[in-house]
Design a protein with these regions (language model features):
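Structural beta-sheet core signal
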Residues: 183, 207-209, 242, 287, ...
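A short alpha-helix-loop-beta-strand transition element characteristic
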Residues: 333-341
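Active-site adenylate/phosphate-handling loop in enzymes that bind or generate adenylated species
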Residues: 128-133, 166, 171-178, 245, ...
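Small/polar glycine-rich anion-binding or flexible loop at a beta-alpha turn
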Residues: 293, 341-349
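A conserved beta-strand->alpha-helix junction
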Residues: 228-254, 342-344
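RNA-binding accessory domains that recognize and position tRNA/RNA substrates
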Residues: 1-182, 195-238, 307, 355-360, ...
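Hydrophobic/small residue at the entry helix of a nucleotide-binding pocket
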Residues: 189-190
Length: 399
């Protein structure tokens, strides 16, 4: 039997005249994800992406796992291809899916015909194939409303495709079709989730992290690298920029009002991120901020943060509560790494009672009293370490 993977379009199918661009981008991504598994022929027709192995002994379990994490597919299935003769369809369905019918009590056959020249109607095909399978498995009953298993037959131009229930995909749009942004990766729970959600909308991402040794450790840096690697499974390859932030942070601590420290630090980070983002051709910044979660994430504080630089700041978590964020972090397998107890620079020097409704005028006044900050920020941006993050299943962090 000739097994292939089918990927079904979702939102992409609504793109009208630009649809070909999205499909081309999607096929490029699928080929890249599959190239380490084996040689695959990837093509698109009738709103479906076909991933057909061209070698024997390809690990189809691994291939399916790889492409199931690609944004742009509403659902997927592993299918077997056969001729469109009805007897061949019956025999192939039994050979491919017969074992899946053992141990269940109810099933249903679904049929779709994009090849309208096929001599049987969809209801006829469902009825006759269902009768054939009942003859092979007389303990089964048909349940068209809530079956335990579905046998699906798709009659297409190039043959009959037989498979079980579709598996939900990640949805969204192919990464890179919406531009590029720089994600503020702190090491906590929120920022990897923010990267995941923006990549789902088609953004290619680089990451930026602020390190403040000796207050933050090398283990904290490795943790952030691990988070970038974990998100790469969904977001694709990226660059991680690690900014040496000790000097600017100490300068703000020593020269600014204690209650304004957090907002002043965030504005400083945004200015540095702005420089690196533009250098990389990024069109926006991404943060994991959620409204009112901490003192720096009130409306007033966010207003002050936004005013520090001129790129759009995308906040995909802004209306999510922590429970929703944690659920997504578990889904993308970043939660357990995020909660490892290593300090990040956002938590050091934090005042006990930060101002939650700062006014921009007082922030600008405080910055005017720190004339040496701009030079320290420029130095930090210039000395940022670039780490290339490639898509990997092997995360380089234990701790």
């Amino acid at each position: 039997m000739h097994e292939i993977i089918l990927g079904y379009q979702g939102e992409m199918s609504l793109k009208g005249l630009n649809r070909n661009q999205f499909e081309s981008a999607m096929m490029k991504i699928l080929r890249y994800r599959l190239k380490t598994v084996g040689k695959f022929k990837v093509y698109c027709t009738q709103s479906t992406f076909y991933m057909e192995p061209e070698e024997e002994d390809v690990d189809m379990d691994l291939a399916f796992d790889r492409v199931s994490k690609v944004f742009g597919l509403a659902s997927l299935s592993r299918a077997v291809v056969c001729g469109k003769d009805f007897d061949t369809i019956c025999q192939t369905a039994e050979e491919y899916l017969g074992a899946s019918l053992h141990g269940i009590r109810t099933f249903k056959v679904e049929a779709r015909r994009s090849d309208k020249s096929y001599p049987m109607t969809s209801p006829e095909l469902m009825r006759e194939l269902g009768a054939y399978l009942l003859g092979k498995h007389n303990y089964l009953k048909v349940d068209v409303h809530n079956p335990q298993f579905k046998v699906i037959v798709e009659i297409r131009d190039y043959g009959a495709y037989i498979h079980g229930p579709k598996v939900p995909g990640e949805g969204g749009l192919p990464v890179g079709t919406s531009g590029r942004a720089l994600n503020m990766l702190s090491g906590g729970i929120d920022s990897p989730v923010a990267a995941y959600r923006m990549a789902k909308r088609g953004l290619a991402l680089d990451h930026i992290h602020f390190a403040s040794p000796p207050y933050t450790s090398e283990r904290a840096k490795l943790k952030v690298k691990a988070l970038a690697q974990l998100t790469s499974i969904y977001t694709g390859s990226s660059n991680l920029f690690v900014v040496p932030y000790t000097k600017p942070q100490e300068y703000i601590r020593d020269n600014a009002p204690d209650v304004l420290f957090t907002v002043l630090m965030r504005r400083s980070m945004m200015r540095i991120a702005n420089v690196i983002a533009k250098r990389q051709g990024c069109e926006a910044l991404v943060t994991g901020e959620s409204l009112a979660q901490v003192a720096s994430q009130t409306v007033k504080a966010l207003q002050c943060t936004d005013a520090a630089q001129d790129l759009p700041i995308l906040r995909p978590l802004i209306g999510m509560d922590k429970t929703e964020i944690v659920e997504t972090a578990r889904h993308i397998n970043t939660f357990e790494t995020s909660i490892r107890p290593y300090e990040d620079c956002c938590t050091i020097f934090t005042p006990p009672h930060p101002k939650i409704r700062p006014e921009l005028e007082e922030i600008l006044e405080a910055e005017a009293a720190m004339p040496g900050l701009a030079a320290l920020e420029a130095e930090a941006a210039e000395n940022a370490e670039r780490i290339r993050i490639r898509i990997t299943d092997q995360v380089e962090f234990e701790g």
